[in-house]
Structure formats: structure tokens, C-alpha cells
Design a protein with these regions (language model features):
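Flavin-dependent oxidoreductase catalytic cores
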Residues: 1-229
Length: 229
């Protein structure tokens, strides 16, 4: 295992990411994950927002953007998996290189830019999954969408994934999509929030909805958003 990790670190980080996920998928299909990555189920389950998580360790959005690795990641025993960020239309994301490894800091920085295969592809993947744990779906807007079209992108994704998501995350935080963080302003956030609230009712979606904000946003802006919610 250490040899494999050492080899992956010699490769560009995005290629390492690709190889690792596909290797995990092969191990899953060969029924080898439980042998190579044994885990126990002794962790105490807990409830949050009406959902029952078998443990507190999960997969955040960004690792499996398109739901291609739900079953293999689920076999590792995570308490939840969040897929995405997904957009209505497929898009390639930013030009490469766009993932950067900082070994001394034990860190990776990504500037992927919402690269994904589109919401219709994701829906096919989650419909056919074997994974039965908590599934979150992270939704976003296409790079070329502005104004009302950007709001429409979120609504389209919401409508298409709501039947399959245990919770939905509305991602307005990405610095890699030009103008997306303008949705943090009250005048732009309110129309989005009202549209999401409306589609939640029409789709009869009673599960949690989370808003992903920029981690370095000013506290006053966050306060305005929470007041609106």
C-alpha cells in the first residue's frame, strides 16, 4: 500500500485522483475492499436534521462529482456521501493544470471549476446505485449562466435530483465559477432562495437543504443570508 501511495505522489495530482478512484472501483467489483480495507461498525450512529448517519465520517462533494464511485466509496464504510457539484449541462471545468499538491503543507488546492458530466448523467448513476447510506447531492450553475439563467440552473438540478437525494446542497461558494459568489449579496440571494423554496414545495421535498457559502465570507454577509433564510 505504501509503495502504491508513493507511486501516486510522483504523478500529477489530478491523474493520481483518477487512478485511485478507478482502482477502488476495480477492487469493489472484485469483492476485495472488505479484505484490504477492513472496518468495523462499532461507531455510534446519530441523527441530524431527521437523517440517521451510521457514523460521523463522510465524503464531501468534489471527490465523486458524477456518482461514478458511489458503491466503491460506500463499501469503505462512510457515514454519508455527497456527490457533485453537478450542473445542468456537462462542462469541462478550468484548463489544466488545475489541481496543485503542496507536500510540505500536506495540502492539495483545486481550481477545477465545476467539471462534471451534467445532471442527467448523475441521475442515471444514483438511480442504479447499490449504496444505501445517506446520499447528499450538491448542485450548482453552469459557468456561462448569468442572471436569471443562473437561478434557473439551480432549479433544474433541484427538480431532477430531488427524488434521489437525502439532502441537497446549494453551492454558491465556488471561487472558480466567475460571478458565482455574487449570489452572496442580498439582492441576488433572495431571488434564488425564493425559487428554491418554491420548487421545494412543488416537488414535495421534505429533506434538508443546505447552502454552501464561501468559508472566508464576511460575517455581516453571512448574517444577512441567515436572516433571509
Amino acid at each position: 500500500m505504501r509503495l502504491a501511495l508513493s507511486f501516486l505522489r510522483l504523478l500529477p495530482p489530478e491523474i493520481s485522483h483518477f487512478i485511485a478512484l478507478h482502482a477502488l472501483k476495480i477492487l469493489y467489483k472484485a469483492n476485495l475492499i472488505s479484505l484490504l480495507f477492513p472496518h468495523n461498525n462499532s461507531s455510534e450512529s446519530f441523527q441530524f436534521k431527521g437523517l440517521t448517519f451510521k457514523n460521523r465520517l463522510g465524503i464531501a462533494a468534489g471527490l465523486d462529482k458524477n456518482g461514478d464511485f458511489l458503491d466503491s466509496l460506500g463499501a469503505l464504510g462512510f457515514g454519508f456521501i455527497e456527490v457533485g457539484t453537478i450542473t445542468p449541462k456537462p462542462q469541462p471545468g478550468n484548463p489544466k493544470p488545475r489541481v496543485f499538491r503542496f507536500t510540505d503543507q500536506e495540502a492539495i488546492v483545486n481550481r477545477l471549476g465545476f467539471n462534471n458530466k451534467g445532471v442527467d448523467y448523475l441521475v442515471k448513476r444514483v438511480k442504479g446505485r447499490e449504496y444505501n447510506g445517506v446520499l447528499g447531492i450538491n448542485i450548482g450553475a453552469n459557468k456561462d449562466s448569468i442572471g436569471q439563467k443562473r437561478v434557473d440552473d439551480y432549479i433544474e438540478c433541484f427538480q431532477k435530483v430531488s427524488a434521489y437525494a437525502d439532502y441537497i446542497t446549494v453551492n454558491i461558494s465556488s471561487p472558480n465559477t466567475p460571478g458565482l459568489r455574487s449570489l452572496h449579496s442580498k439582492e441576488n440571494f433572495l431571488p434564488l432562495f425564493k425559487a428554491i423554496s418554491h420548487v421545494r414545495e412543488t416537488e414535495n421535498f421534505s429533506n434538508p437543504i443546505f447552502i454552501k457559502l464561501s468559508p472566508d465570507e464576511h460575517i455581516d454577509v453571512i448574517s444577512e443570508i441567515t436572516k433571509a433564510i
